[in-house]
């Protein structure tokens, strides 16, 4: 027994002493680049986590170790991803120091679909030489910085099929036979973000997965000092360069991002005055209790989709506390403790260095050039019917205003404006099926062509649609929906071959 233990220990030490670059790397990419002028099988607009999950699922479907029939797939899918950013990045503007993920690392881009995949978070740790060290953290919640690095590591495996720095501007229907009335491909036009050059690629199938765009309250002026939370870590340091200066900084919002920024500003600019402005009466904790968390289980999408529109809306409202305008309890407690210590020193809140102004809304912002501070006008967010006593009016003079008011998820409407006429008669908006393929008039569009939407289907697929929780499983569903017939043919061929042996 002792010799076995020593042998095991020796083997472990040998692996532990290997440098990360000596460890086994992933297999050669199973997705290969396609010449731009060729007709693609699939073109994905955007290469964030949603598209990355599709790439991983397709890679795994072509891996004979995971899919016995993969060796019968003779033609590699012709696929390309177009991404506006110059490299893979996930919420780079909100990689706040010390911030952690809000979901388990098991909900990575592969594990829930197939834990044997090479693209699991645990394999990432193994390849980086940190697996044993991570276990010592005793947590399921990695640092947000590390999880972004995990996704970047995954993305690097697909560099051959991603065109970075390409912003898609429109999708145009096309016909191989000009005399035909049926669309059988799409032309995706993109602009190079550096040169402005326009490129065009033809594809049978299109996935739109461009994520959200910054939502800014109406009435806020265009000013470089008014910054959306998505650009906090990338833009504010360049604007307020001297960390020792006594800046005045305001944050608008009551959700996780607003709370993280408000908390981080106090460390980043220790001599500054910070103010958190919110419509709500208080920060509210997110509900991540086990039973409630089951709404993010991948199989719950089926149940949600099968409901009527009215039932879906009721479900969204009932589950709002899991995701919208809520903050993790641990952070709320930290912020409250900081506020309390100020109260110990001075009971007059107006004199505090860091303040929270609940039940307020911004009515207007005066800005008279970069040399003078912006003036923010506030009033009560309560309905006027509740009395004039609540009509508090205040002004703040600030060097910067961080706006953490969420995201819009309707950018696909603009990209697909030239395809709208292909919707069924009387349909005034895109209607995704359960497999995320949008409904089109079959008399106008070939069954070989299609468009899929990702991350903008909350009203039909539930709260998890724009979140990481379902991406591993959904990536597999997308591959099945797009390439299912090809994969099934390969499976049949495999069964026939084995039957002959």
UniProtKB/Swiss-Prot annotation:
Keywords (A to Z) from UniProt: FAD, Flavoprotein, Monooxygenase, NADP, Nucleotide-binding, Oxidoreductase
Ligand binding (NADP(+)): 254-257, 279, 323-325
Record-listed substrate binding positions: 107, 293-296, 323, 469
The record ties this protein, via Pfam families, to: Lys_Orn_oxgnase
Q: Name one GO molecular function term.
A: iron ion binding
- Catalysed conversion reaction: L-ornithine + NADPH + O2 = N(5)-hydroxy-L-ornithine + NADP(+) + H2O; L-ornithine + NADH + O2 = N(5)-hydroxy-L-ornithine + NAD(+) + H2O
Question: Where, by residue number, does FAD bind?
Answer: 83-91, 102, 168, 466-468
Q: How does it assemble?
A: Homotetramer.
Q: What does this protein do?
A: L-ornithine N(5)-monooxygenase; part of the siderophore biosynthetic pathway. Aspergillus fumigatus produces four types of siderophores, low-molecular-mass iron chelators, including excreted fusarinine C (FsC) and triacetylfusarinine C (TAFC) for iron uptake; and intacellular ferricrocin (FC) for hyphal and hydroxyferricrocin (HFC) for conidial iron distribution and storage. TAFC consists of three N(2)-acetyl-N(5)-anhydromevalonyl-N(5)-hydroxyornithine residues cyclically linked by ester bonds; FC is a cyclic hexapeptide with the structure Gly-Ser-Gly-(N(5)-acetyl-N(5)-hydroxyornithine)x3.
What name appears for this protein in its UniProt entry? L-ornithine N(5)-monooxygenase
Organism name: Aspergillus fumigatus (strain ATCC MYA-4609 / CBS 101355 / FGSC A1100 / Af293) (Neosartorya fumigata)
Question: What does the organism's lineage look like at the top?
Answer: Eukaryota, Fungi, Dikarya, Ascomycota, Pezizomycotina
């Amino acid at each position: 027994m002792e010799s076995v233990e020593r042998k095991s220990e020796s083997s472990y030490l040998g692996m532990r002493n290997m440098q990360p670059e000596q460890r086994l790397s992933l297999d050669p990419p199973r997705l290969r680049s396609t010449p731009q002028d060729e007709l693609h099988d699939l073109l994905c607009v955007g290469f964030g986590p949603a598209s990355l999950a599709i790439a991983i699922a397709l890679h795994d479907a072509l891996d004979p170790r995971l899919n016995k029939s993969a060796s019968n797939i003779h033609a590699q899918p012709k696929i390309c991803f177009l991404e506006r950013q110059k490299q893979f990045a996930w919420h780079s503007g909100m990689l706040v120091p010390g911030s952690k993920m809000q979901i388990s690392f098991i909900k990575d881009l592969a594990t829930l679909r197939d834990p044997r995949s090479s693209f699991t978070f645990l394999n990432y740790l193994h390849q980086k030489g940190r697996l044993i060290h991570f276990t010592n953290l005793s947590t399921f919640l990695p640092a947000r910085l590390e999880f972004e690095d995990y996704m970047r590591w995954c993305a690097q495996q697909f560099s051959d099929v991603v065109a970075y720095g390409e912003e898609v501007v429109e999708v145009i229907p096309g016909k191989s036979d000009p005399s035909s009335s049926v669309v059988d491909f799409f032309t995706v036009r993109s602009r190079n973000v550096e040169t402005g050059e326009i490129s065009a690629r033809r594809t049978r199938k299109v996935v739109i997965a461009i994520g959200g765009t910054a939502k800014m309250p109406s009435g806020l002026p265009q000013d470089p000092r008014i910054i959306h939370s998505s650009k906090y870590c990338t833009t504010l340091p360049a604007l307020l360069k001297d960390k020792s200066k006594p800046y005045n900084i305001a944050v608008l919002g009551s959700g996780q991002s607003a709370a993280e920024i408000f908390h981080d500003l106090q460390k980043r600019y220790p001599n500054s005055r910070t103010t958190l402005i919110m419509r709500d009466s208080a920060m509210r904790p997110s509900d991540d209790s086990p039973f409630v968390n089951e709404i993010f289980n991948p199989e719950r999408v089926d149940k949600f989709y099968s409901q009527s529109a009215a039932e879906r809306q009721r479900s969204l409202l009932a589950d709002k506390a899991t995701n919208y305008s809520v903050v993790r309890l641990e952070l709320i407690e930290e912020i409250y403790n900081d506020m309390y210590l100020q109260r110990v020193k001075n009971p007059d809140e107006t004199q505090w260095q860091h303040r929270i102004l609940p039940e307020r809304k911004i009515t207007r912002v005066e800005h008279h050039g970069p040399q003078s501070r912006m003036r923010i006008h506030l009033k009560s967010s309560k309905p006027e019917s509740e009395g004039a006593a609540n009509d508090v009016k205040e002004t703040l003079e600030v060097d910067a205003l961080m706006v953490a008011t969420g995201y819009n998820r309707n950018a696909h409407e603009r990209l697909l404006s030239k395809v709208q006429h292909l919707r069924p008669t009387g349909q005034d908006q895109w209607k995704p099926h359960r497999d995320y393929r949008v409904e089109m008039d079959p008399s106008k569009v070939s069954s070989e062509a299609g468009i899929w939407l990702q991350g903008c289907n909350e009203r039909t697929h539930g709260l998890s649609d724009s979140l990481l929780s379902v991406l591993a499983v959904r990536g597999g569903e997308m591959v099945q929906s797009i390439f299912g017939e090809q994969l099934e043919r390969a499976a049949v061929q495999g069964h026939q071959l084995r039957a002959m042996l």
